[in-house]
From Swiss-Prot:
PANTHER family: 2,3,4,5-TETRAHYDROPYRIDINE-2,6-DICARBOXYLATE N-ACETYLTRANSFERASE, ACETYLTRANSFERASE. Pathway: Amino-acid biosynthesis; L-lysine biosynthesis via DAP pathway; LL-2,6-diaminopimelate from (S)-tetrahydrodipicolinate (acetylase route): step 1/3. GO terms for molecular function: tetrahydrodipicolinate N-acetyltransferase activity. Its EC number is 2.3.1.89. The gene is dapH. It comes from the Bacteria. It comes from Staphylococcus carnosus (strain TM300). This is 2,3,4,5-tetrahydropyridine-2,6-dicarboxylate N-acetyltransferase. Belongs to the transferase hexapeptide repeat family. DapH subfamily. It holds the Pfam family Hexapep.
């Protein structure tokens, strides 16, 4: 389902999705005669199991078999979740531990998503783009190629309240740490957004903007090359 979602389509998708509360359950006991439901994924030995199941299914199972269960430990990291995390097995990018990337986000080749970054449903991370630590791409936010989104920066989503126009970051843009790009804003190719800026209007290609609200302060041609370099070595994957 890789497509350009509208906000309304995402809202409908979330509304219609079967909500899930998955559990990981560690069980010790006399389990050799216990019959596990087909909906369970069960691993382990006769007297010690690891079970993956839905919370509602576990309650019924436990009540029926608690006389056989001696010890139990339950891990739960979500409740009534509508959107699972993205399956990254076929993603040709560098994804670091602790990044949260939701299903139906697009991560293009050679991208980098750092620890703590959040990529919401419908967002697009372009080829060779780096999403730095704790940055957020809200629903439908889109980056082009070779963009750097600095640590803690926010590209606002357009799911709630629904907005027709997502944030669009064109190719070769640098966004400083803790900058905020508001809904509907387009940042033109090669522009630079200073750290901490709040961008409320479109940014022309090649402009440098700073402040709250952000305003053009100069052109990127006036910035040293070393301060706007995209380092290809950081995007290198295994040969």
């Amino acid at each position: 389902m890789v497509k350009d979602f509208s906000a309304e389509e995402i809202i409908q998708y979330i509304s219609d999705a079967k909500k899930s509360t998955p559990l990981k359950v560690y069980v010790n006991g006399v389990l050799g005669q216990v019959t596990f439901p087909d909906s369970f994924k069960v691993f382990g030995s006769e007297n010690s199991k690891v079970i993956f199941c839905e919370a509602s299914d576990w309650e019924d199972f436990y009540n029926d078999n608690k006389n056989y269960i001696e010890e139990v430990e339950i891990e739960m990291d979500r409740r009534n979740s509508a959107i699972p995390l993205k399956d990254l097995r076929n993603t040709n990018a560098r994804i670091e531990p602790g990044a949260f990337i939701r299903e139906h986000a697009v991560i293009e080749d050679g991208a980098v998503v750092m620890m703590g970054a959040t990529i919401n449903i419908g967002a697009v991370v372009g080829e060779g783009t780096m999403i730095d630590m704790n940055a957020t791409l809200g629903g439908r936010a889109t980056t082009g190629k070779n963009v750097h989104v600095g640590a803690g920066a926010v590209l606002a989503g357009v799911i709630e309240p629904p907005s027709a126009s997502p944030v669009v970051i064109e190719d070769n843009v640098l966004i400083g740490a803790n900058a905020v790009i508001l809904e509907g804003v387009r940042v033109g190719e090669g522009a630079i957004v200073a750290a901490g800026a709040i961008v409320t209007q479109d940014v022309p290609a090649g402009a440098v903007v700073a402040g709250t609200p952000a305003k053009v302060i100069k052109q990127t041609s006036e910035v040293e090359d070393s301060k706007r370099e995209i380092v290809s070595a950081l995007r290198k994957l295994n040969d």
